[in-house]
Each structure stands twice: as structure tokens, then as C-alpha cells.
Amino acid sequence: MVEQSDTMKGTTTVGIVFETGVVLASEKRATMGYLISNKTAKKIYQIAPRIGLTTAGGVGDAQQLARLMTVEANLYEIRRGKRISVQAASTLLSNILHGNRMFPFYVQLLIGGVDETGPVLFSVDAVGGTGKEDGIVATGSGSPMAYGVLEDRYTLGMDERSAIELAIRALRSAIKRDAGSGEGVAVVVITEDSYHELSDEEISVLTPN
């Protein structure tokens, strides 16, 4: 049995469903025990044209899963002639993780995007347990601090800018109190029309006071 504390170290990631899309966000710190091993760690991966994956946990496990999911999403589109849906991608990811439950990937993941059903967001644990998130979700060691902000400020059907600002605010709260989180934030916005990773300049403009 994998304890939750074993899969939630050294990261904070956030997912928010807004009116027309999904915001995925993370901070950039990677740690090895008490050492800050990387200050520009990538924790959000594009696995399909309108689907993103956030990762918390072991870096090697997360990178391997991101590569595998990208390949599987491409194969799905080639074989079926249509893009994989967010739910199908979460089910595939769940099956991969559950199939390795005796030798688990030490990760906690969010998978979100926009498909024919609209904006969709799922959380996935280390042994394949999935849950559809209706509005907000956070993972990693800083998630308790992030949830405090998300629960207080999230409103159903909020607009894109408000969702981005909320994600940044939640991550900043986690960074202030969680030693495993830090070094700035990364933000991805997924809508029906685009998958867009915000630049540092865009983030600085949208960062709430």
C-alpha cells in the first residue's frame, strides 16, 4: 500500500476549471532531501493538443509517464482518427498506474483539458485511483496552503483571467510556507482554441498584489 505522504513531496500543482477552459499551474522547485536540486523544474506537460498533465512526486517517474502518455495519445489519434478525450486519457493513465501497483510510480497527477464535452479536470493517484474535479484541485506538499486560497476564492464559472490570478495566488501562498515549493510559477491555459504556456512577462502582469 502506498501512503499518500510518499507521493506528495516537494511540489505544489494546481488545477482550476473556468468558464471556457482549464488552468494548470505549478511552482518550479525540485528537491533531494534538504537540497534544492533544480530551480527551473518542469512539472506541466502537454500530452495532446488540448490536454495537459501536472506532476508531483519522483521526477524520473513523472517524466517517463509524460512521455508514455504523449505517445499513447498520438497512437490513439492515428488509430481512431480523432483526438483522445480527457476522460479517456485519465482512464489510460489510471490503467498504466494500476498495472504497476506492485512497483508503483511515486507520483500524484492532474490531467486536464478541453474536449467535446467542455473543460474537464481529473486527479490521479499513484496506484490509478481517479477522481473528476468539478472546480479546483491541488497536489503536492504545498497543497494544504494552496487549498486554503482556492476554497476561499473560487467561484463556479469564473473567467480566464480570474482563474489565472487565483492559481498564481494559491501557489504564492504555498511557496511562502512549504519548503518543497518555490522558485517562481508556471501557468498553462487550455481552451477549445489553444494550449498556451504563459511567459514570465505574462505571469508578472497577471500576478495579484
Curated annotation (Swiss-Prot):
<dbReference type="InterPro" id="IPR000243">
    <property type="entry name" value="Pept_T1A_subB"/>
</dbReference>
<dbReference type="InterPro" id="IPR016050">
    <property type="entry name" value="Proteasome_bsu_CS"/>
</dbReference>
<dbReference type="GO" id="GO:0004298">
    <property type="term" value="F:threonine-type endopeptidase activity"/>
</dbReference>
<feature type="propeptide" description="Removed in mature form; by autocatalysis">
    <location>
        <begin position="1"/>
        <end position="10"/>
    </location>
</feature>
<dbReference type="GO" id="GO:0005737">
    <property type="term" value="C:cytoplasm"/>
</dbReference>
<dbReference type="InterPro" id="IPR029055">
    <property type="entry name" value="Ntn_hydrolases_N"/>
</dbReference>
<comment type="similarity">
    <text>Belongs to the peptidase T1B family.</text>
</comment>
<keyword id="KW-0865">Zymogen</keyword>
<dbReference type="GO" id="GO:0019774">
    <property type="term" value="C:proteasome core complex, beta-subunit complex"/>
</dbReference>
<keyword id="KW-0645">Protease</keyword>
<dbReference type="Pfam" id="PF00227">
    <property type="entry name" value="Proteasome"/>
</dbReference>
<dbReference type="GO" id="GO:0010498">
    <property type="term" value="P:proteasomal protein catabolic process"/>
</dbReference>
<protein>
    <recommendedName>
        <fullName>Proteasome subunit beta</fullName>
        <ecNumber>3.4.25.1</ecNumber>
    </recommendedName>
</protein>
<dbReference type="InterPro" id="IPR023333">
    <property type="entry name" value="Proteasome_suB-type"/>
</dbReference>
<feature type="active site" description="Nucleophile">
    <location>
        <position position="11"/>
    </location>
</feature>
<keyword id="KW-0963">Cytoplasm</keyword>
<comment type="subunit">
    <text>The 20S proteasome core is composed of 14 alpha and 14 beta subunits that assemble into four stacked heptameric rings, resulting in a barrel-shaped structure. The two inner rings, each composed of seven catalytic beta subunits, are sandwiched by two outer rings, each composed of seven alpha subunits. The catalytic chamber with the active sites is on the inside of the barrel. Has a gated structure, the ends of the cylinder being occluded by the N-termini of the alpha-subunits. Is capped at one or both ends by the proteasome regulatory ATPase, PAN.</text>
</comment>
<dbReference type="InterPro" id="IPR001353">
    <property type="entry name" value="Proteasome_sua/b"/>
</dbReference>
<keyword id="KW-0888">Threonine protease</keyword>
<keyword id="KW-0647">Proteasome</keyword>
<dbReference type="InterPro" id="IPR019983">
    <property type="entry name" value="Pept_T1A_Psome_bsu_arc"/>
</dbReference>
<comment type="function">
    <text>Component of the proteasome core, a large protease complex with broad specificity involved in protein degradation.</text>
</comment>
<keyword id="KW-0068">Autocatalytic cleavage</keyword>
<keyword id="KW-0378">Hydrolase</keyword>
